[in-house]
C-alpha cells in the first residue's frame, strides 16, 4: 500500500491502472477501488483446481499467464509490477511484456556464482544468506525473465546487518530461535524497504534512466554499475 498511500510519485511520475490478485480475495480491494483503480481477482489455486492439476504444472501456468494477459491488456499497462507473487512467470506474460515485468527479491542479486546465477534465489533467500554466513542482506528490484531471480537488477537496497548473535545461536544449535530470527530479519527488510525501493525503481524507469532492453545481463560485467546516494533519506542504492 506504500505506492497508493505514501509515494509522492504516484499519478505524477507513474500511474497505477489496475491491480490483479492471484489469491481468492484482495485485502485492500476497497481502498484501492476508492482511488478509482480497478481490482481483478484471478485466483491461481482455483484456476489449477478446475484443471485438476498441481501448482507445479508449468503447462497450466502458461494457460494461467495467458489469461492474466487477457485481463490486463484492456488497461494498456506499460509495466507489470509483481508484489508478493511467488510463482514462475511463463512465456505468455514474458512475450506480452518483454523486459517490462519487475519484481522485488529479498537478496542482493549482484552476488553471483561464476556461471552468472544468483547466489540466493527463491523465496528462502534471506534464510539461505544467513545460513551461508553473510554479515548483511539486501533487497533488489529486478526485471523478470524465465529463470527465477535471474533478470537484470534495477535498484538495490541499503544493507541490513545480520546480528552477531546468529553465530552464537548456530553454535548452540538453537534452530528454533534461529528460525525466529530469520523471520524477524526478513520482516525488518519488508517493513523498511519494500515500498520505497519499488517506488525508486519505478521513478528511475519512468524517467528513462534504466535501459529496460539490456536483456543480455549475465551477472559477470559490473563495469556499468553506478552507486547513487540520496534517493531516500539515509539509504544508498545501486542502480544497474
Give the positions of each predicted feature.
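One-carbon transfer enzymes
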Residues: 1-240
Amino acid at each position: 500500500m506504500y505506492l497508493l498511500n505514501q509515494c509522492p510519485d504516484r499519478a505524477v511520475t507513474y500511474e497505477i491502472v489496475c491491480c490483479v490478485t492471484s489469491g481468492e480475495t484482495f485485502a485492500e480491494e476497497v481502498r484501492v477501488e476508492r482511488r478509482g483503480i480497478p481490482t481483478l481477482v484471478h485466483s491461481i489455486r482455483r484456476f489449477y483446481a478446475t484443471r485438476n492439476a498441481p501448482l507445479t504444472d508449468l503447462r497450466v501456468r502458461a494457460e494461467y499467464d495467458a489469461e492474466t494477459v487477457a485481463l490486463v491488456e484492456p488497461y494498456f499497462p506499460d509495466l507489470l509490477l509483481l508484489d508478493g507473487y511467488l510463482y514462475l512467470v511463463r512465456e505468455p506474460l514474458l512475450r506480452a511484456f518483454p523486459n517490462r515485468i519487475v519484481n522485488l527479491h529479498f537478496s542482493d542479486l549482484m552476488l553471483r556464482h561464476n556461471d552468472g546465477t544468483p547466489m540466493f534465489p527463491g523465496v528462502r533467500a534471506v534464510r539461505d544468506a544467513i545460513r551461508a554466513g553473510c554479515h548483511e542482506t539486501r533487497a533488489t528490484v529486478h526485471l523478470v525473465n524465465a529463470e527465477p531471480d535471474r533478470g537484470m537488477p534495477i535498484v538495490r537496497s541499503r544493507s541490513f546487518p545480520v546480528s552477531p548473535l546468529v553465530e552464537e545461536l548456530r553454535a548452540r544449535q538453537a534452530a528454533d530461535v534461529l528460525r525466529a530470527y530469520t523471520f524477524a530479519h526478513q520482516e525488518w527488510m519488508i517493513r523498511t524497504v519494500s515500498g520505497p525501493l519499488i517506488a525508486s525503481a519505478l521513478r528511475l524507469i519512468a524517467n528513462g534512466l534504466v535501459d529496460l532492453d539490456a536483456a543480455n545481463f549475465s551477472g559477470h560485467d559490473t563495469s556499468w554499475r553506478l552507486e547513487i546516494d540520496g534517493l531516500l533519506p539515509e539509504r544508498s542504492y545501486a542502480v544497474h
